[in-house]
Amino acid sequence: MPKSLPLLDPAGTAACCPPLSAEPLSQAQAEQVAPLLKALADPVRLRLMSLVASHPGGEACVCDLGDAFDLTQPTISHHLKVLHEAGLLERDKRGVWVYYRASTQALASLAALIGDPRL
């Protein structure tokens, strides 16, 4: 005969397991954050975002990022463009090179979504 588990008192669970978020996302918040998460859903783009954000000086160009991947420069540029179009990266053209830096506003939106108190 299967053994049943005891039910927990919902009032008592708040002490051991605080909610992950103060309140659910509104429709507008979900629509704002969804494109950011969609852009980050690719492992290459997630890693590119991490590399740019942690790069010395807070910015990097394709020439700085190519050695970290077994991908062609045009492919890396495409992924950087997707991140830029989603608002995760800002860019600045200097001569023939385009330098990318993480958008602090987009990162703050993501941090608020996951409840990171540092941002």
Describe the function of each predicted region.
Residues 118-119:
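A common structural junction motif
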Residues 1-40, 86:
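N-terminal leader segment of winged-helix/HTH proteins
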Residues 52, 113-114:
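Residue-level signal for well-ordered alpha-helical positions
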Residues 67, 78, 84-85:
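Alpha-helical residues within the helix-turn-helix
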Residues 87-90, 95-96, 111-113:
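Short, Lys/Arg-enriched C-terminal cap helix and immediately downstream tail that follows
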Residues 27, 31-72, 94, 98-105:
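N-terminal helix-turn-helix DNA-binding core of bacterial DNA-binding proteins
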Residues 74-75, 80-81, 98:
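Recognition helix of helix-turn-helix DNA-binding domains
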